[in-house]
Amino acid sequence: MSPYNYARKESLFESLVCEQYEHFIGLFQKAQQDFSNIPQEEQPKHLGDISDACMDEMLLYAYQHLNVFKLILCHSEGTRFSHLIDEMVEIELKGTHDYLAVLEKLGRPAPPIDEHLEHVLITGMFNTFFELIIHEMSLEKAQYYLKEMRAFYTAGWMKIMGQ
């Protein structure tokens, strides 16, 4: 497939990365939905279970399609695919707000979280995740770093949420 067959970068990227992009976002959306389907009183006990499994699955999927994800992460500027992190941040923000509402209902309200700080922290979390892919380290090393990253962010969020 020659890049000269495409009138615009957007249509070239559409043919090269769309399927994997949509699947990747779908994995993340499914994890959010699966967590929200847990009975509310059980959600605090299972906070990391689904998200940990999802992050593992997303990392493995990205490594299975490494060239595609390198295109998305490093060369998609000017296409809709350049908004991967922003799209994931929006999904995570909604999930976080839904969970905060559950904590409130359970009588375990979190202190108010500044919306800008929340956005910065979530964006930082996804940037950290995607650095694992950008740097093309071994899968084993990336999986280890992901485990450490999750422990780091989970501890921080638990502190901020007063849990």
Positions of the model-derived regions?
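Short hydrophobic/aromatic patch on the recognition helix
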Residues: 1-6
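Alpha-helical structural segments
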Residues: 11-37, 49, 53-57, 83, ...
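Solvent-exposed, amphipathic alpha-helical segments
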Residues: 23-34, 68, 124, 128-132
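Short helix-coil transition/hinge motifs at the ends and kinks of transmembrane helices
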Residues: 36-45, 104-109
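Amphipathic alpha-helical segments that line or abut small-molecule/effector binding pockets
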Residues: 41, 45-67, 123, 127, ...
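Amphipathic alpha-helical packing segments from all-alpha helical-bundle domains
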Residues: 57-64, 77-105, 116-123
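Short, hydrophobic secondary-structure boundary micro-motifs
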Residues: 70-72
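Hydrophobic/aromatic-rich alpha-helical bundle segments in the mid-to-C-terminal region
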Residues: 99-152, 161-162
